[in-house]
Amino acid sequence: KLKWGTNMKVKVAAKINLMLDILKRLDNGYHSLFMIMQSVDLYDTIMVEENTENRSIIKCDTEGVPCNEKNIAYKCANAFFKACNIENQGITIEIEKNIPMAAGTAGGSADGAGVLYCLNKIYKTNLTTTELAEIGATVGADIPFSLTGGTAIALNTGNVIAPVKDLPECYIV
């Protein structure tokens, strides 16, 4: 059991696709992809803290963001608890949005990745980034990349990440 007052706050980055190639359609309806992704200097802030409700609560400062079980951050919290066989004794996830919604910049996935990172630290489960990415991939294709950031090649449905040398600082229009 956690002690009351346990909380953590992180900034999570948006991403852009520098390249996306659809290789083939998979039997499950998804597509096998080859992508080059880059995190960018646009961030949401995620705070995870205990509550006394024995359930996950989502709070967000932006209209239109679902504050219920449809939220990717909420889904990631549930996936974490299930994968780690931990009873959710109550957490509040507060999202401060700066990454635009539905813009293809992985705002929801970044939020979910931030929740996984925070819960791993708060609950001291010591999962590796690869293990967190496996949990995240059950929720969304961009979550594994959002856990690592930087510049990376993403394969399959986005669940296989291979970091590459960072791009030089530049402007993208």
Language-model regions: role of each:
Residues 73, 103-129, 145-147:
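DPxDG-like acidic metal-binding loop motif
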Residues 1-7:
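Short, Lys/Arg-enriched N-terminal segments with co-localized hydrophobic residues
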Residues 34, 91-104:
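Short pre-catalytic strand/loop immediately N-terminal to key active-site residues, enriched for Gly-Thr
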